[in-house]
Every structure is written in C-alpha cells, then in structure tokens.
UniProtKB/Swiss-Prot annotation:
Alphabetized GO MF terms: tryptophan synthase activity
Lineage: Bacteria, Pseudomonadati, Pseudomonadota, Gammaproteobacteria, Thiotrichales
UniProt name for this protein: Tryptophan synthase beta chain
Subunit structure: Tetramer of two alpha and two beta chains.
Role summary: The beta subunit is responsible for the synthesis of L-tryptophan from indole and L-serine.
Length: 396
C-alpha cells in the first residue's frame, strides 16, 4: 500500500484519537488512487473551469504603485465562484467523498468562506452539509452565514472557548469522531492531521501553476516574489507550491500582527509561537509558558487561528520562505487603497498580503521588481466590519 509522507521536516504527523486513523487511512488511499485516475482529474478540471470559473485572471495594478518602479500583479482568486480560493480544494475533496461513498460532510469555518464553498459543493454534488462556526464569527460574518443556509447547509454556532475558528475546529473533529463511518470531515486549510495538508495543497496548487504560466506570457519571466496571507496557510501553499523549486522567486507569507506583535493580540505563530501539538499535527502554536493554547486575534476572521500548516513551518525552517506580518491598521489601509485606486474590494485576509507588497514597493521606489499578490478572496463579507471600524475612527 503506497503512502504519502506524513511529515514536512519535523512538522506535521497524525495526532488523532485511534478511532479516526482508519478514516484518515481511507482518505489517503482514495486520494492516491484519484491522483492516478484520469477520469477523476478530468471531472475536477471541468468543475473548476465550468462551475468555479478557472483560470482566474492575473491583473496588473494600474494606480496603486504608480510612483514606484514596481510592477504589481494580483492573482484574482476573488473572482472565483464562492468569492475565494476555498472553492478549489473543496470541490476536490467533495469529489473524493463521492468516491468513498459517503453522504455527509462536516466542516469548520472562520470567515465563512470555507463554509460557503463547502455548502455550494454539497448542493452541487447532493451531499448533506453541516458547518461549525465560532459564535463570535457567526456575528461578524452574517452574510456568509445566510449564504450557507440558502444553499441548504446547517450552521452550528460554537460557544465554547474563544468562540472562534479553533473552537469550531475542535467541535468538527468531535463530530467526525462520532460519525466517521458515514461522514467526511472536509477540512478548510492546509493544516490538521496527515493527509490533509498534502491533499489541500495539491487541490490548491493550480493557483501557482496558473500564475507561473500567466506571468511568463505577460512579462516573459517569473516574478521576483509571490506574496500571500497566512492563517492556516492554504491560499499561500497553493501559490507557493509550484514556485518552491524556482530558487530565484521569493516566497513571502504574511501573518496577522493584529494590534501589534508586542501586545500579544495577534495570530503570528510562525514567527512568534512555539512548537506544539494541536488540531492533529505538530506545528508552531501560540501558547503560554504553561503550554496552554493562547487565543489568536486578527481583524480578519479567516486569519484568526493560533497555529499554521506544517509545510509553512518547514519552509521557514529551511529558509525557503520568509514570513512577515501586517497589523490590523496596515491591512485596513491596504484594503481602502485597493478600493479607491483599483476598484477592487479585497478580503481583509488578502489585504494583509497586499499591505506587505505595498511596503516592499514604497520602501525603495526606485527598485525595479515584479511582485504577485495572491488576492485570495473578495471583501463583500467584510464591508460591515470595515464600516464599523471606519465609523469609530470618524473616517465616515
């Protein structure tokens, strides 16, 4: 029986109750078979093209870095059906569920984007869907909650702990432990127990593959850097995967610095966490001196996660990728700028990556560079959050 590698260097693994091991083994074997099955690959490709709208555009910005010698491109995952990159891998996993003969899907969601993507895939492929969501996130992401319900999903608010994404993850895992024989846990990011980090990366890698082809067609060369926000890390690993062997292309992930790293209110475990076991994997983790998990914080619900995917930890450890951070205020400024200068409303998550790209462009305006930001999602879901913040600041 062929197996995938469960670790990325020292990170990853499969730290789960024994009861879930057969379900994870089954998932791994189905994935290996599917990857070798041309009909599966063709169906996945057709769904991505005909239903989700791939390939997504690579848009050159016109105004936002006008006074610099930087050329800044945006990989437009915001244009994907469902509003974010999440749709890519959800369609892949949902097809795997059909192959396994299961009829129910369990999911967790933070910003609601993964929940929406799961709900639409379940509606399309006739699967029963229940989504766990932190009660706090249910409040701050009401449009996405209603979208999920419109598409037939059951949304279950989680009130335990900090009532955010990590608590939703724990509840979803509990549900799966009780119902694994008939239900599949459709994990929303490139984290969690093996084989999820590998499966999610492979079902997101078209982001980087398309970017590479589009960049060669537009500029005749590869970018100097690709930049993506990092919460759990799926949009970033989807962008990075095809560039890992291109040593001249910098890979830059941007974690949420929240109210400032020094305040402790952030979501940057890669640079400011300690290695621990959480959510079925060994990975960097925000924890206190007693080893208890600390609550993460970010203006964007989708980055509000105290850990990170194991491959990102490995890429940092071997020096292949760099990880920066952007504060709430920096992300908000980038959000406003893209709206005003380019007519694009980005997700607050993606705005963190954009903030770092703008920093690179303006810290040396005379430097010629070619940058790509993965615009991982659109900001419709965030307009009420932004409205309230700007009102509080007296800007509107």
């Amino acid at each position: 029986m062929s197996k995938l590698n469960a670790y990325f260097g020292e990170y990853g693994g499969q730290f789960v109750p024994q009861i879930l091991v057969p379900a994870l083994d089954q998932l791994e074997q189905e994935f290996i078979k599917a990857q070798a099955d041309e009909s599966f690959k063709q169906e996945f490709k057709e769904l991505l093209q005909e239903y989700a709208g791939r390939p997504t555009a690579l848009t050159k910005t016109r105004n936002i870095v006008k006074n610099t010698r930087t050329k800044l491109y945006l990989k437009r995952e915001d244009l994907l059906h469902g509003g974010a990159h999440k749709t890519n891998q959800v369609l892949g996993q949902a097809l795997l569920v059909k192959r396994m003969g299961k009829k129910e899907i369990i999911a967790e969601t933070g910003a609601g984007q993964h929940g929406v993507a799961t709900a639409l895939a379940c509606a399309l492929l006739d699967l029963k869907c229940r989504v766990y969501m932190g009660a706090k996130d249910v409040e701050r992401q009401s449009p996405n909650v209603f979208r999920m319900k419109l598409m037939g999903a059951e949304v279950i608010p989680v009130h335990s702990g900090s009532a955010t994404l990590k608590d939703a993850c724990n509840e979803a895992l509990r549900d799966w432990s009780a119902n694994y024989s008939k239900a599949h846990y459709l994990l929303g990011t490139a984290a969690g127990p093996h084989p999820f980090p590998t499966i999610v990366r492979e079902f997101q890698r078209m982001i980087g593959e398309e970017t590479k082809q589009q960049m060669l067609a537009k500029e005749g060369r590869l970018p100097d850097a690709v930049i993506a926000c990092v919460g759990g890390g799926s949009n970033a690993i989807g962008m990075f995967a095809d560039f890992i062997d291109e040593k001249n292309v910098k890979l830059i992930g941007v974690e949420p610095a929240g109210k400032g790293i020094e305040t402790g209110e952030h979501g940057a475990p890669l640079k400011h966490g300690k290695t621990g076991i959480f959510f079925g994997m060994k990975a960097p983790l925000m924890q206190n001196s007693d080893g208890q998990i600390e609550e993460s914080y970010s203006i964007s619900a989708g980055l509000d996660f105290p850990s990170v995917g194991p491959q990102h930890a490995h890429l940092l450890a071997i020096g292949r990728a760099k990880y920066a951070s952007a504060t709430d205020d920096e992300a908000l400024d980038a959000f406003k700028l893209l709206c005003k200068k380019e007519g694009i409303i980005p997700a607050l998550e993606s705005s963190h990556a954009l903030a770092h790209a703008l920093k690179l462009a303006y810290e040396d305006p005379n430097k010629e560079q070619l940058l790509v930001v993965n615009l991982s999602g659109r900001g419709d879901k965030d307009i009420f959050t932004v409205h309230d913040i700007l009102k509080e600041k007296g800007e509107i």
